[in-house]
């Protein structure tokens, strides 16, 4: 069976179960670890029997267990870079790319020549690694922390694979962090436990709950970071968060209560998603 035939057969299987047919192509491309261009030029190439068997095993796993693509193949792409994904870290989200974009936009406009950056709740390390690779015209020192040793091991592996020099620290937020930072960035757990029933099984069953849910209606980590950030921000330092679509007012309130001026930006779906907080001395 060649690649095109395998994809057509997989599409039929997915269609019968009312699944997204585009998964058929992307799953085979990811499994073979090829770029879109490489893959498109080899559609008539025969699959090895081992490849064919593995491919349809993965297709059936998605159908029967609703396993996400990234967990089927063990990696995902973020900002055009490849990152290892396991059950111990979140799969990369498109919304987080928008957080990266806003941070890069801020850095580009800044008159500073160097930045010391702290990435709290780093998970797989995608934020820290992407910033290290994308900021090329200014010097950066990046520290990334997480409370999960398993997540940190994945982040370290991802940094090595992407040739990104980052300091990783096991820490519950600021507990083991020292020094001042020009930027504090975080995409912390922010889903309220009461919203758990609204979350898709493909997320609940495969993403770590430690990285998804937070107390205080999802605000706990934002509150802890905002209340303590002044001790870790350098002069004119800034905080960037990814936030839940319904958390804007709570972030504004937390910012105001701790002398921060808050700006919230919408994502591509016109939902409140990125918060920027500047300390109002």
Regions found by a protein language model. Give the residues of each.
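Conserved Class I SAM-dependent methyltransferase catalytic core
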Residues: 84, 216-278
């Amino acid at each position: 069976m060649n690649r095109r035939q395998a994809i057509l057969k997989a599409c039929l299987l997915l269609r019968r179960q009312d699944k997204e047919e585009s998964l058929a192509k992307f799953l085979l491309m990811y499994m073979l670890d090829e770029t879109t261009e490489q893959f498109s030029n080899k559609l008539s190439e025969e699959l090895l029997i081992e490849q064919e068997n593995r491919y349809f095993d993965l297709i059936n796993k998605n159908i029967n267990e609703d396993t996400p693509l990234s967990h089927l193949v063990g990696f995902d792409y973020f900002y055009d870079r490849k990152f290892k994904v396991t059950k111990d870290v979140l799969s990369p989200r498109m919304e987080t790319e928008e957080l990266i974009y806003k941070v890069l936009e801020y850095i580009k406009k800044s008159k500073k020549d160097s930045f010391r950056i702290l990435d709290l709740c780093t998970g797989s390390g995608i934020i820290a690694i992407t910033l290290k690779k994308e900021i090329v015209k200014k010097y950066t020192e990046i520290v990334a922390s997480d409370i999960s040793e398993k997540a940190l091991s994945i982040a370290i592996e991802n940094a090595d694979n992407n040739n990104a020099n980052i300091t990783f620290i096991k820490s519950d937020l600021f507990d083991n962090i020292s020094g001042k930072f020009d930027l504090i960035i975080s995409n912390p757990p922010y889903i309220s436990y009461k919203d758990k029933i609204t979350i898709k099984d493909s997320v609940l069953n495969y993403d770590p709950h430690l990285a998804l849910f937070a107390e205080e209606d999802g605000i706990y980590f934002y509150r802890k970071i905002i209340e303590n950030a002044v001790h870790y921000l350098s002069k004119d330092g800034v905080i960037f968060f990814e936030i839940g679509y319904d958390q804007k007012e709570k972030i504004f309130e937390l910012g105001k209560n701790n002398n921060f001026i808050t700006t919230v930006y919408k994502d591509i779906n016109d939902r409140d998603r990125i918060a920027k907080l500047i300390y109002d001395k």
